[in-house]
């Protein structure tokens, strides 16, 4: 299945985070890029960022991972309805970054 840039996708049931191994079923975001190796680069939506929480974002920062985005196989995601706006994503991400700075992370 091909996805378009900006299209909303959801992670399929049973998919785990490739770095930490926990379940990310249902996480949603927007397609930023699709490459020729059948992987899709996703920027998480604001609801997923809120669900992820500050603790995981901090853990990602400590491991030098970008917590706002993830690359998954095309077979691991499916089309979904858009749940927010890009402004919502920017607002939540900025809030989380500010909290990390406050905490000295």
Set out the residue ranges of the language-model regions.
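Basic/aromatic-rich interaction segments and small domains that mediate binding to polyanionic partners
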Residues: 3-76, 80-90, 102-105
